[in-house]
Amino acid sequence: VADARKRNHSSAKAAGARFEREIADWLAVHVDDRIDRRVKTGARDCGDLAGIRAHGQKVIAELKNTAAWNPGTWLREAEKERANDGALAGVVIAKRHGIAAPAQQVVLMTVADFAALLTGVRPAEQEGS
């Protein structure tokens, strides 16, 4: 039996916006009340949430609510947005389908971003380091 709840472009955008709002609201309560959804800016996008900081520096978050996982593409997008914003690190927050609780969603990042979050210093941008 085919799933009757197939997404179209409009319903996918609405689901993405809902996911962004749920994550932003949860982070605002549990981390910093300045965290909120970011206004979309086009080619120089700086992530989906604003107000995330670590060690006094900006961190960008790219949020994904899609059944098909593509972590490589998502991480490249987060890195581009991190550079656009001059942020310390970039992370991807991905929806775990069937799991509603915002705190139970998944965060993906490179080891370089993980090190930056832990130390407050972005590692040298050399291949393999």
Where are each of the predicted segments found?
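Catalytic phosphate/metal-binding cores of nucleic-acid and nucleotide-processing enzymes, i.e., regions
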Residues: V1-S129
